[in-house]
Amino acid sequence: MIDVINLEKHFDGNRVLNGINVTIEKGDIMVVIGPSGSGKSTFLRCLNCMEDPTGGQIIFHGVDIADMKVDINVHRRNMGMVFQHFNLFNNKTVIENIMLAPVHLQCKDLKKAKRRNRIIKLTNLFRGKDKKKAPVEITTTKAEIVKNAKIKAEELLERIGLLDKANVYPSTLSGGQKQRVAIVRSLAMNPEVILFDEPTSALDPEMVGEVLDLMKALANEGMTMIIVTHEMGFAREVANKVLFIDDGQILECAPPAEFFGNPKNPRLKEFLSKVL
């Protein structure tokens, strides 16, 4: 699904990522761990080009999305992102937060189709009868887009037990509730992969479990996930690959049993001795 080849990222001459190579297959649950400042979050943000890579390739479905000539927004539709601090819009209700991206993007596509049809209609005036172009088929309206997005958002909120919070603002929610809303907001776009940047680190300990339970459910459904986290128990239980990054390099990548039970790299052994 995703091939990362010799990925590099520099900030003001400082090399934060140094030749990252890794493959993420469909259905992988890959947990990324490492000390603070090691490049974990930068790696994640480079995967959907929230940070432009300095060098290397990120091949997603055969397309190098690190190439500046590629329309990254087309590919971001298939790659959800969940942030450490939720990043909900405080001036919009919970359900509006979930509906925002699907409605915006589908309405944008609708406007493009209508504009194309106007151009086709105009240019057809100057074409011969046998050379006229057929208009783009339009099968929806803005009202239908909004209606369907609302239905989907309500289904997602019901799934996480927060349907009664649909019309409240994020400021009234607990941290755990905000993060669950952020996760289903990502699901509203029907992504093929979701990137999680330390999704529990800003939560009170009592609220961590409800977020991890939702992530476990997604894993059981086959969602491809790449997760930067300090939750070692979650990594042991749910991941099929665990990646250790230090000083901008991958020092070890292995299944959880091998990664935690028989680490090869001395730096990883040292790190695990301090966190387990």
Set out the residue ranges of the language-model regions.
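ABC family nucleotide-binding domain
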Residues: 1-256
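C-terminal boundary and immediately downstream tail of ABC-type ATPase nucleotide-binding domains
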Residues: 253, 257-276
